[in-house]
Amino acid sequence: MNPLRVKLDALISKTSLTVTEQQREQLVGYVQLLDKWNKAYNLTSVRDPMEMLVKHILDSLVVSPHLVGERFIDVGSGPGLPGIPLAIMHPDKEFVLIDSLGKRIRFLKQVIHDLKINNVLPVQSRVEEFDPESGFDGVLSRAFASMTDMVNWCQHLPKPNAGVFLALKGVRPDDEITLLPEWCSVTDIKALQVPELEGERHLVILSRKG
């Protein structure tokens, strides 16, 4: 068996996630494509595919149980994190992956084609200039910006009254929380357990007040 698949299976076994055979193969395929493209396009500072499984794949997958709704947007998606792993985990949900760099969008289109992922739309745009036809249940960000910048730049993206912001962070970002704009409030903070990852991970869930 592919060593990446062996490692992925071992990591998943340390979580409570349910991941099908097809999803596991797609996740491994994604890492292989990321590794291949990374050599030419410098999409991530993580060079070792085994390390990518922990720092990129599992770090994204642990958000999976906290997705409520049908439509999500991953802002500043980069090479598709956390959007691609989450889209693989949730084929019944729609994901828009937005990034301003053309090389990243080209990579995402290749991933979608090669892995036959049909619930992802890659968009090349600055997030503050993106004008969707309708709002999203969740606005995801990972290593994108401060939470204040994120909610200010993305405040037009969540569904009115129902949509939330989902910010994936390291240590609990209490300093950032104190700087949030008046209209925004923290509704929950989830401590995330990522197998074999050093350091803390937290998911901060935010929404518009009222």
UniProtKB/Swiss-Prot annotation:
Cellular component annotations (GO), alphabetically ordered: cytosol
SUPFAM superfamilies cross-referenced by the UniProt entry: S-adenosyl-L-methionine-dependent methyltransferases
Pfam family, one: GidB
Entry-linked Gene3D superfamilies: Vaccinia Virus protein VP39
Keyword tRNA processing set for record: no
Protein family according to the UniProt entry: Belongs to the methyltransferase superfamily. RNA methyltransferase RsmG family.
Name this protein carries in UniProt: Ribosomal RNA small subunit methyltransferase G
Gene that produces this protein: rsmG
